[in-house]
């Protein structure tokens, strides 16, 4: 059964930007908003005070901010819930609390992960964080079911349109599906892989929950070892012209996503304003 709540009332738009918390700022959020993207996703494990999210909302007028994700192991529900309520009161319908259990290699305390997710969501219920105001990091079928029944929907990370298709079948209609996809705006495949491969290899190809998900999608162990095969890297990191990359993002929408968030990778790791501008033009949102 779905917990008490209503369908998501937050508008994410069709396209968003996913970026690690260390590379975000209120100024960049304002620029992203001006380019026509609907949502900024705060990557990493932002702390429970949600100060960065609040500062980006303060600096913008219509942009939605989502966490991708607050880690259940490091941030108790009792810590993040008051922050959620503070922001939701100040910026109604502009903040989505994305939460997740992370991965077992990240903490020595990683035990009973599924039960931990359930207990965390139970506590959010007790603290009046609405179902419609939260999303769940989800890859496998059991957690996708939780995302469907206990949150506004799922935020899968490091996936492909094939996963989006199967996730939509699992979630059914009317449930948010917002996958992340990495992109490099470079038409040279070797140069693009040189940027994308390290961001996939470390740490994700060494983490069993991501490897298990890729295996479910049909990728062989050999594709995941030694930095990832070219075919796997190309599937997980879209590259090419802005128009080619936009078409790859649209494959998620065609497969059933409501929203797709692009993680724009650059060789120098600097804020990718120029690439975001080019991508926004190709997506037709600028």
Model features per residue range: what roles?
Residues 1-286:
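Active-site-adjacent structural elements that line small-molecule/cofactor binding pockets in enzymes
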């Amino acid at each position: 059964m779905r917990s008490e709540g209503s369908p998501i009332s937050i508008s994410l738009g069709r396209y968003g930007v996913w970026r690690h918390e260390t590379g975000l700022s209120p100024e960049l959020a304002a620029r992203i908003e001006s380019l026509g993207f609907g949502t900024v996703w705060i990557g990493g494990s932002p702390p429970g005070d949600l100060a960065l999210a609040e500062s980006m909302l303060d600096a913008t007028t219509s942009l939605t901010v989502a966490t991708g994700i607050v880690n259940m192991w490091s941030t108790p529900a009792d810590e993040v819930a008051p922050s959620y309520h503070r922001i939701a009161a100040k910026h109604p319908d502009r903040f989505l609390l994305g939460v997740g259990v992370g991965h077992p290699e990240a903490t020595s305390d990683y035990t009973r992960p599924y039960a931990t997710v359930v207990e965390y969501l139970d506590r959010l219920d007790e603290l009046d964080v609405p179902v419609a105001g939260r999303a769940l990091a989800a890859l496998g079928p059991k957690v996708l079911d939780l995302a469907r029944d206990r949150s506004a929907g799922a935020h899968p990370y490091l996936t492909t349109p094939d996963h989006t298709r199967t996730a939509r079948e699992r979630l059914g209609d009317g449930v948010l599906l917002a996958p992340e996809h990495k992109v490099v705006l470079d038409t040279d495949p070797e140069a693009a892989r040189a940027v994308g491969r390290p961001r996939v290899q470390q740490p994700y190809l060494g983490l069993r929950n991501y490897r298990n998900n890729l295996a479910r999608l049909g990728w062989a162990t050999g594709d995941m070892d030694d930095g990832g095969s070219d075919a796997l890297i190309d599937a997980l990191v879209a590259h090419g012209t802005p128009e080619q990359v936009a078409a790859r993002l649209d494959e998620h929408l065609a497969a059933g996503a409501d929203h797709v968030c692009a993680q724009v990778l650059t060789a120098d790791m600097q804020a990718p304003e120029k690439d975001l501008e080019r991508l926004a033009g190709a997506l037709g949102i600028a």
